[in-house]
Amino acid sequence: SQNTRIQQDVADLDKASGMVINDLMYKHWDHYVTTAPHPFVATFNGNSITGAEDIMKGEPYECPMEPFGGVEQLAWSPDGTQIAYTCRKKAGLKYAISTDSDIYLYNLSNKTTRNLCKPDGFVAPEVKVTESLERQSINSPHSTDDYNMGYDQNPQFSPDGKYVAWSSMMRDGYESDRSRLCVYELATGKKTYVTESFES
């Protein structure tokens, strides 16, 4: 058979272009996804970099996020002790159908991370992956909980370091949702949407 011939003729192997795919998001628009970018913190003395540390070590997620994310998805606190970053911590099919990214706060001294968009222990409602997210409980218009289920990205600290602001969308799975400016008070966890009364 043809398969046997290829296996016997080693010279033909370099002509093969097959790939083993074990995750849904193996390609993003125009390129294959083979790695996940991570932010690193390091010491720079003007000539060399030392002590590089991956602030998302061991996590299979990306920051900045595909396809348009860049350095605007990260922010240093004014006192240099924390980094706010954007990430969608989902994998496989859940990643592929969701726009639910969050803002995370990494503490450089104790190396802990907390989600500013959702409370500790939050578990998103299960979704029916073959149906639109629009009318599922994850996007319920009757919910009084503010879990920032859509895109949350591009964090910035206030000059006094007391607040983090970011662009926020309300609904999961809806890339054209209206962007709101969310201002988060670090001391209390209170969120304020300062653009709610604006016309869009």
Predicted regions and their residues:
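Short amphipathic alpha-helices and their capping/turn segments at secondary-structure boundaries
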Residues: S1, G70-L74
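Hydrophobic beta-strand positions that form the internal "hydrophobic ladder"
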Residues: S1, G80-I83, G161-V164
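Predominantly five- to eight-bladed beta-propeller fold
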Residues: S1-G58, T86-K89, L93-Y104, S137, ...
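Multi-bladed beta-propeller domains
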Residues: T43-G70, A96-T99, Y104-Q153, S168-D177, ...
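Generic structural hydrophobic/aromatic packing signal, biased to beta-strands
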Residues: I55, L74, G80-I83, L116
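A short, structured loop/turn motif at beta-sheet edges
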Residues: S77-P78, N107
